Amino acid sequence: TATEKYPTLRTHRLGVGIYTLTDDHLTRTELLDVDIHDERTPIAALVGHSRGDLVLLNDSDLTYAKVRLDDHSMATLIDRIDALSDPLARALCWSSAWDMCRDAEMRAQDYVTLVGKGLPSETDLTAVTALIRQATTAAISYSNAEDRQEVRDRLVAILATGLRDAMPGSDHQVAYANGLATAATTDAADLLKGWLSGEEVPEGLSIDQGMRWRLVTALARVGRVGEDEIAAELQRDNTISGSEQAAGARAAMPTAQAKQAAWQRATTDDSVPNETYRQLVMQFIQPDQTE
């Protein structure tokens, strides 16, 4: 498609893959390369053809395109994306699903369910980190207010399971721990607070200074730590980085006084360093702080 303002349609070479669930694997059974010229391009070779369980447009990633998954294909992925062994095909499905979620064409809870199904079988750290980040954004920012707590609880359960199953001391373990801290609600606050004092820390997980600030900020966001605890952490990490993180933790607190102080500092104090300003802005708005 093209906008009315810029109606130019360019030719694309597009792969159309047909995948069928066989012996617990989503296997590609057909691949057609199609040249797209117009707004609609009939594909005669597929007329009367079995649609399979998944139809993947732009299979093999031949062109730069924003594609959509049909309802049947999406239902297949939500149920069995872990059966799609081809990493490129799986990456294309992840990309399409995230585009649909961001464009309000896929419910946030369905995206979180999809991530929960496929995340355990992903081994690439970049993919794991991106999926955790995107699922967290979907749960916190894109879900309906009335469903948000349920969606976040589901995500927290997914991340807790991933953390439990991750290899001790691995980067994947850190990715799950970071995600859990970011997505955590008040129900997980006791666990996170325990990590700060060395209690029930998963085997191999290093609670270094970076992780400590992530935990402090998460706890500040849900009102489980306040100014005294943030000041104590800053005394422990009396560095420029510590000062920046403390500013963010204070801005995350769910009180009118904390928000007013952060707002004033961000909008009226020209001496605020760039990274401190970034922390203030990043932590100021929290979707779960609606009052």
What are these regions (language model features)?
Residues 6-9, 19-32, 42-291:
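Long, ordered, helix-rich scaffold segments
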Residues 37-41:
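Ser/Thr- and Asn-enriched, surface-exposed coil loops between beta-strands
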Residues 1-4:
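Gly/Pro-rich turn-and-neighbor structural signature
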